[in-house]
């Protein structure tokens, strides 16, 4: 709860998007645009509705998930420290985060992230401990299970929420993230007493995902069920979404005129692009964005 409701990532986002940092805010686990129901509603808007975020819009000032409490997690922090102290945890907790040793950019990003932890949590609660690996995150970090957390992501392989949500379930050898990132699948084999509530939450989440995945004759009901499962995952912070990765370029092509498929090979086709002899400006792109948003809203 402290992670999801307390960390202000704005300065960290600015490392990716200096002009509009909060355009990088990610409050959901499934990427936008993967699928739509028969009413034309994009799937993550269903998750937003389940979480009470459906009325919240980008304002360029405050992260959506920090608006309800203004980022104030003092009560949650106090509760967490009391509960963790009761099982022998000492503070500050060290959150170990690995970056590749050869990248100065990765170090700069991690340094900003460390400051976000400090500003949001206070140095008496959780401190980011930046560590490095030489060449292989898998061999040097994931396999020996040295990480406290990993910031990672991927694009859709196919157009259905199970593509994402199935990665975090229990009792499934194909749940890649459960087995190789959070390692929760291994915890499930022999949980300690203090992990009971966490495992109960993962079991409930797994049941919700499996129930949604069993709905194969009603697309709208399937997506509604997955949205409830995803909202449960996020409200219980079984994972904490961080940011949308974007690429910067000085371009003579209007990105809003390109094919924007969420999966498959279509994006590699250079057809029907709108182009300009002069590189587009920020002002022009703001106009493109407004026109695009108006078009998709009908």
Question: Which residues are covered by each model-predicted region?
Answer:
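Soluble non-cytosolic domains of exported or imported proteins
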Residues: 6, 64-71, 103-111, 196-203, ...
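Pocket-flanking alpha-helical
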Residues: 11-14, 135-172, 233
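Hydrophobic alpha-helix feature that most strongly marks membrane-spanning transmembrane helices
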Residues: 17, 118-122, 142, 155, ...
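Bilobed periplasmic-binding protein-like "clamshell/Venus-flytrap" ligand-binding domains
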Residues: 13-17, 74-101, 197-253
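Ligand/substrate-recognition segments at binding pockets and active sites
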Residues: 56-156, 247, 298
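Solvent-exposed loop/turn segments at secondary-structure junctions
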Residues: 9-12, 19-23, 34-37, 101-105, ...
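Short, solvent-exposed loop/beta-turn-alpha elements that line the ligand-binding surface or hinge
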Residues: 35-71, 85-89, 139-145, 166-209, ...
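Periplasmic-binding protein-like
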Residues: 1-48, 59, 64-72, 109, ...
């Amino acid at each position: 709860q402290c992670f999801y409701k307390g960390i202000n990532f704005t300065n960290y986002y600015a490392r990716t998007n200096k002009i509009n940092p909060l355009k990088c805010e990610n409050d959901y686990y499934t990427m936008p645009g993967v699928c739509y129901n028969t009413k034309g509603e994009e799937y993550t808007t269903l998750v937003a509705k389940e979480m009470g975020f459906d009325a919240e819009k980008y304002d360029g000032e405050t992260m959506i998930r920090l608006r309800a409490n203004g980022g104030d997690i003092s009560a949650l922090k106090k509760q967490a420290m009391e509960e963790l102290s009761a099982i022998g945890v000492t503070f500050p907790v060290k959150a170990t985060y690995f970056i590749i040793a050869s990248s100065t950019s990765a170090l700069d990003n991690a340094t900003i992230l460390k400051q976000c932890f400090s500003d949001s949590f206070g140095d008496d609660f959780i401190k980011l401990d930046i560590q490095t690996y030489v060449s292989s995150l898998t061999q040097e970090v994931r396999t020996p299970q040295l990480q406290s957390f990993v910031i990672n992501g991927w694009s859709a392989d196919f157009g259905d929420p199970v593509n994402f949500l199935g990665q975090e379930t229990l009792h499934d050898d194909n749940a890649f993230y459960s087995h190789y990132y959070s390692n929760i699948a291994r915890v499930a084999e022999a949980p300690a007493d203090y992990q009971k509530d966490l495992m109960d939450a993962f079991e409930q989440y797994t049941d919700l995902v499996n129930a949604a995945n069993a709905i194969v004759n009603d697309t709208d009901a399937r997506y509604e069920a997955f949205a409830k499962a995803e909202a449960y995952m996020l409200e219980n912070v079984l994972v904490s979404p961080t940011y949308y990765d974007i690429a910067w370029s000085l371009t003579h092509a209007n990105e809003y005129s390109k094919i924007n498929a969420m999966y498959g090979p279509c994006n590699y086709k250079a057809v029907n692009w709108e182009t300009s002899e002069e590189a587009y400006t920020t002002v022009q792109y703001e106009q493109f964005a407004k026109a695009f948003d108006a078009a998709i809203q009908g």
